[in-house]
Each structure stands twice: as structure tokens, then as C-alpha cells.
Amino acid sequence: DLETGQELWQCGGLSRNVVASPVAGHGLVVAANSYDWQAMLAIRLEGAKGDITGSEQVVWSLKRLTPYVPSPLLVGQKLFFLRHLQGILSCVDIRTGETAGGPWRLPLVRMVFASPVAAGGRLYVVSREGIALVFDHQQGLNLLSANHLDDQFSASPAVVGDSLLLRGDRYLYCLKAASQESSV
């Protein structure tokens, strides 16, 4: 409770080492881990009270390919998430947990710490190895480009207007569409 600081609800099922940020949408909050074990839980916020572990408030759960470092990304009803040391991207319907695409092994990348971002109908994934992948995610997952940058990336990209900001270990990059007809 924001006014009193009292705990409203709690839910077990994740390890104590949760790095990825939770994602909220469609009346649910989704939290995940994969350090000690792999787990992702979707919790219905309405009516959540007390210890909801194993209750009907937990709408769905996954036990494989869950993220450790990169946070999941919600685009409409699609929840995208990365298995950070394997370069595997998965997608589920946030409402049901049912597969909505993938899993896809991403080309050229293995280690991903940065969270994926989406803008202009495109999905962006940046790897520790300096590879920035751009996908069309409207129908499946289609690779549009793979950009090799002379840097390593742990920070998540930021979309600002029609620009994409990437913070590498050595440089800050600003990528912008080449023409007004295309967008970030």
C-alpha cells in the first residue's frame, strides 16, 4: 500500500536473485529469473491479497528459456524475452503464456545483457559482442539488419523520437533513420 507501506501480496516461485525488471500489462505483472532455476510467473493484480503462491492469481508460469539479465518486453499482447547467455528469443501471449512465436536462436549473438526495445514496428537487440540486430516482429521474426559496432553493450537501448541511443563500454551511439520515410 503506497500510503501505509504495508505489503498487499506476495508470491513465491522465483529465486532470490531476480535481475530482470518485471513487466506489467493487461492486468498482469510478469516477473522472471533464471539464476538458480528458470521461472517466469504471470500474476493477476486484481484481487491479489496476502500469499498468492500457487493460487489462481498466478495465471500462468514457465520453467524454461526464461531471462536472467535482460528484462522482458511487452509489445501489444506479445511478451518477448531473451535467454541471455544463449542468444535465444522467445515470445508468448501475455494473457495466456501460450507461445506466440519462437523460440528463435538469434544470428551472430550469444551473450545479451541489454533488454530488447521496440519502436516503429521493429524490435532491437544489442549484444555484448557489439552486434545490433533489427527485426520486423509483425509476422514472426524477420531479420532486417545486423550491425557490427566496435564496442560492447550491457545497457539497454533507448528510443528518443526517431533516434536509437546505444551506450557501449566506450562510446555513446545515436542511430537515426536515413530518410524521413523510414523510422527507427
Name each model feature, range by range.
Residues 1-184:
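Noncatalytic, solvent-exposed loop/strand surfaces
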